[in-house]
Amino acid sequence: MVRSFVENEVDPQALQYNREEKFNAGVFNRLGELGLLGVTVNPEYGGSGMDATAACIVHEELSAADPALCLVSCLAHSMLFVNNLDQNGSHEQRLKFLPPACEGTAIAGMCMSEPGAGTDVLGMTTKAVASSDGSSFKIDGAKMWITNGTVDGVTTGDVFLVYARTGPGRQDISMFLVEKARTSSKHSRRGTEGFKLGQKIEGKCGMRASMTAELVFDGVGRENLVGEENGALLCMMRNLEIERVTLAAMGLGIASRRCIEAMNAYGKERKAFGNPINTFGQMQKHIADSYAEYMAGKYYVYGVAADLDLSSAGNGLDADGTKLYCTTMAKNVADRAMQVLGGYGYCDEYQVERLWRDAKLLEIGGGTLEAHHKNMVRDLAKNVVTLP
């Protein structure tokens, strides 16, 4: 079902929306109709009730055609907000916010990075201070590089999970629901005072059909605190694993049907010196290495996903490992595809040019390569085990 949807509805629009740098609300709504925006969420709250493997399949298939759409809808919206709230929110919070997010009538995201804090997430300076009577918090600060922070360059997305410092300790972080005022046929809400768009981020190298922004905050109600005060670090760790494995699956999508299939088809058809170029050793190396690396990554990602428990944090080592391997693999495969296609690969009509640009973000967002190296060596040193 997902592959058919991608071929018929996602693929035809990808080039246009990349060129125009616009968010495709119509395809986003279709994802909601198909149950793909709440793929891991309990059906009680409007989701499809599936597992991490299903989430990886959706990310891989969508990224084969349009990684930017996947980033907007399945990664930022479905994993960073929807899955996060489903695992960490109260029944009342889930009942209020998840149905519109799952059906695609609200667009959501998560706010962690700041202008001065990215990989060092505990270095965030955005603060949430409780009022004297304890009924509300005042959030003061700004978040940067927020996917879905805007969908039109003028207004914000609908609702976000925002991490903010609530105590003096380095780990005293809490998570809050922050929303803009909105009215629809099914859902109306007042919104959070002091929540506004800072700036839309322009001129990105890739993922141009995903909208990225700075968001500014000032004031939020206590009922929008998610989980325990000063307890968001556990929420963060719990959701990082599925985020990283699905980002790795996006790398598989970039490498697979578009880049490897493009190399394979072009190598058979294009002739040089009287022979198909896939008869030359240099081209054979590009194609064969890419296929072998893709298959290795595929088994790694789906093996880890099969054992992933969405309700707990337990396999950070391999969540980091899949993303470390597959994101760099995707960039390298896209680079080889561009090399095999030559001048055609350098033009956006052949799509490998766009995938080449999109792939780079995967090595940065959701944890840099350097952060994965640090995390993995730390975990391996703590738990010296016999490798499988």
Outline where the language-model segments fall.
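A short core secondary-structure module
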Residues: 135-136, 140-195
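FAD-binding core of FAD-dependent oxidoreductases
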Residues: 67-83, 102-117, 142-160
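A structural signal for short hydrophobic beta-strand segments in well-ordered beta-sheet cores
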Residues: 126-130
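Long, acidic (Asp/Glu-rich), low-complexity accessory segments flanking structured domains
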Residues: 215-235
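Cytochrome P450 core scaffold surrounding the K-helix E-X-X-R motif
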Residues: 47-50, 119, 187-189, 226-230
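Short Gly/Pro-enriched turn/cap motifs at secondary-structure boundaries
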Residues: 116-119, 150-153, 165-167, 203-211
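Flexible, small-/acidic-enriched active-site or ligand-binding loops
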Residues: 184-220
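Alpha-helical interface subdomain recognition
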Residues: 1-65, 75, 88-93, 100-105, ...
